[in-house]
Amino acid sequence: MALVMHTYKGNKGANKALIAAEYAGVKIEESADFQMGVTNKSPEFLKMNPIGKVPVLETPEGPIFESNAIARYVSRKNGDNSLNGSSLIEYAHIEQWIDFSSLEIDANMLKWFAPRMGYAPFSAPAEEAAISALKRGLEALNTHLASNTFLVGHSVTLADIVTICNLNLGFATVMTKKFTSAFPHVERYFWTMVNQPEFKKVLGDAKQTEAVPPVPTKKAPQPAKPKEEPKKAAPVAEAPKPAEEEEAPKPKAKNPLDLLPPSPMVLDDWKRLYSNTKSNFREVAIKGFWDMYDPEGYSLWFCDYKYNDENMVSFVTLNKVGGFLQRMDLARKYSFGKMLICGSEGPFKVKGLWLFRGPEIPKFIMDEVYDMELYEWTKVDISDEAQKERVSQMIEDAEPFEGEALLDAKCFK
């Protein structure tokens, strides 16, 4: 008999086991035609879990309920993986972070989320206490992640899977960018993990809510219908006042960068030159760049990742940079970038070069892309020939770069 997961699609608790199954090579079938409120109240389901909660995993040895227990079972099913650590102390630390995530993150986040969604009565003091406790948990997690890529050891464990599934619900519902920006290492960790193939296969494309849901309003009681009076002659209806009609949609506000004085440098021309130059790159593309470059209308910036000591695993480092470039998509019209991942083994160094419209890094990028805070930014002085040559080398992916091999070079254009 195959393992069968009984729950509705997208259940946070079930996702823990489904992601663990991807890492552990365990096959799990998801029950067809599951209807919450119907299937879980049936006699057959109640035999598996007497209180009717989901998820439930049906196994050849019998059913299992409680999501962390299910995830633990799946993570050990094949035995040949690192989800539970490589030593007794690592196993204990994994269990420690699972408990921490459940009690300090998930429990407090649900106390904030449930009333806002109408699943529980709303109380402002209770919400304030829940948010305060959640912040305390996130601060502790942020401190740990300042010097650790994963919660335990140097690879994904069950602790990471459980924690990310808990955080994912918060990011999707109540934890806005304004809220999470106080915890940059948690943000980096979350976006790095959800972009791993095993997580992405189960969670899809993770998104962050833009606003906290409003408090549900209670329906006011309907007033008693007054007794009908004899009908009077209806007054002549007035023509509707134009001012009371729907307002015409307001024109979309222009990006401040569109209001800058015109520049002789056309960014799309540079991007085409970069993409189409297949040989003699230094003589054609690099020379063309410096011929085009307008220091009045554009600025060049070096960036260096602040936490290179964390970059011990190549694929995690590459995904970290890839996630950064994805989140820079909102700036594509106004920027060009090169990101170099340097080194033949960890810790890998991440260095970048960016061309931005305007004399400074655009404010909307600093506000919207949390990764910006994870880098040291230095404006390029093109009167310094050494800095100018460094720009040229970064554009052409020169190797070795500053004495180190290139693990990869990524271009944003």
Swiss-Prot record:
Span list, region Disordered: 207-260
Short name of any one Pfam family annotated for the protein: EF1G
Record key words, sorted: Elongation factor, Protein biosynthesis
An annotated GO cellular component of this protein is: nucleus
What domain of life does the UniProt record list for this protein's source? Eukaryota
Residue ranges occupied by any GST C-terminal domain in the UniProt entry: 87-215
What GO molecular-function term can you cite, just one? translation elongation factor activity
**Which InterPro entries does the record cross-reference, listed alphabetically?**
EF-1-gamma_plant (IPR044628), EF1B_G_C (IPR001662), EF1B_G_C_sf (IPR036433), Glutathione-S-Trfase_C-like (IPR010987), Glutathione-S-Trfase_C_sf (IPR036282), Glutathione_S-Trfase (IPR040079), Glutathione_S-Trfase_N (IPR004045), GST_C (IPR004046)
Q: Name one GO biological process term.
A: response to zinc ion
The GST N-terminal domain extends over 1-82
All copies of domain EF-1-gamma C-terminal, residue ranges: 253-413
Complex and partners: EF-1 is composed of four subunits: alpha, beta, delta, and gamma.
Q: What does this protein do?
A: Probably plays a role in anchoring the complex to other cellular components.
The name on file for this protein is: Probable elongation factor 1-gamma 2
Native source organism of the sequence:
Arabidopsis thaliana
